[in-house]
């Protein structure tokens, strides 16, 4: 055994010496390689804008549409009024507890819409919960051959993240059941969505706020629902915010929940090299924030990012309120924040 070890050692040394004397670099077999996230380049791939006669698929990758037939009919009417054709996901009205069918059924509807080159946009019917359960079932191979717009917000943030990390733009906007009390789509929401999908430049002027932290920033707009951004941390669907402007909205949370999620984003580096933050609607907060936290929500957020000097815009009309304007995620924007007036301009 001793002599065998001597022979093995001699062979190893001989191989090392040969490798050192070779004019070619030795072949190294990597073990346990850790691939770091790669920052997305400045310009993401933009799916083709819609034109009259194009087809849009309406699917529900998350919550069920129980008693929502009238709302979907209104969604179809809206798209038809833009001279667009509509197809519905085969399983869109299925129910599996709170979901629109099983994970397999919801994934199948979304996959068919991704794969069909004749479908030019996918409009998600609603959020709720369930999108994260189908993320790893989706195959974007055909999507990359024939990119299309994916539209939605709230729980659809998970898919926006996934598409962003593939290098494509998507649209954060109203969904198929986003109707007002009159069972109609508010014009202030429908008009910018139409502009976004047909290629008209989006530019918003927002009333100022004394809580705003003034400044000017340029960068890709990324983000969405805070809970979903927090849920994605540590996964391949988390996003790189370096050099970008982060949009956040939330609904139905207590102050300490919001603080905890923001602190988690901070610890994950979301604010380290961020260019700016746009805060959308923080809606239907549970409890009395002044009684529970002692400060308004704006100050809670400013406290989390106090060591950074980027601009912070509050009260942008996007999120879980009736006024929910379209945002093109992945598009470069110019953000100008003031206490009297602020602007968000998308660069076409």
Locations of the language-model features?
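Conserved anion/nucleotide-ligand pocket segment
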Residues: 169-234
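Internal helical hairpin/lid segments
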Residues: 240-296
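ATP/NTP phosphate-donor binding region
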Residues: 29-118
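A short helix->loop->beta-strand "cap" motif at the edges of active sites that frequently abuts
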Residues: 118, 144-149, 168, 274-275, ...
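Short Gly/Thr/Asp-enriched flexible loops that form oxyanion-binding sites at enzyme active sites
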Residues: 127-145
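ATP/nucleoside-binding phosphotransfer catalytic cores, i.e., glycine-rich phosphate-binding loops
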Residues: 281, 285-348
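Bacterial Sec-dependent N-terminal signal peptides
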Residues: 1-31
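Short, acidic/small-residue loops that bind anionic groups at enzyme active sites
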Residues: 140-163, 169-175
